[in-house]
C-alpha cells in the first residue's frame, strides 16, 4: 500500500494528512510564527509496520523545509523519527 506521495493541510482539522488507499495517516499540528509543532502523529493499526508513517514524516518534513519552518516534535514518534533521520536535523527547533 502506498501513499499519494504528498501531504495536504486540512484547515478544518488543523492537521496534515496523507492518504494510503482508503486509510489516512495524519499529524495534528500547530503553527506559531516560523515553527510547526507536531503534537500527534497517527497511523491506523492496519498501516503500522508498513513504513507509512515514515513516508508521511518524510513528506511532512519536506513541507517544513519548503515553507521555511522549524519543526518542534511534541509527539514521541515524531521526535524519535527526526532523531533517526540526520538529513532533517537542520529543521528541528
Positions of predicted regions on the chain:
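N-terminal first-folded block
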Residues: 1-36
Amino acid at each position: 500500500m502506498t501513499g499519494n506521495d504528498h501531504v495536504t493541510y486540512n484547515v478544518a482539522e488543523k492537521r496534515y494528512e496523507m492518504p494510503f488507499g482508503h486509510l489516512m495517516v495524519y499529524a495534528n499540528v500547530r503553527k506559531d510564527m516560523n515553527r510547526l509543532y507536531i503534537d500527534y502523529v497517527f497511523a491506523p493499526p492496519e498501516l503500522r509496520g508498513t513504513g507509512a508513517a515514515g513516508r508521511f514524516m518524510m513528506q511532512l518534513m519536506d513541507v517544513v523545509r519548503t515553507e521555511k519552518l522549524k519543526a518542534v516534535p511534541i509527539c514521541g514518534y515524531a521526535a524519535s523519527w527526526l532523531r533517526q533521520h540526520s538529513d532533517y536535523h537542520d529543521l528541528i527547533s
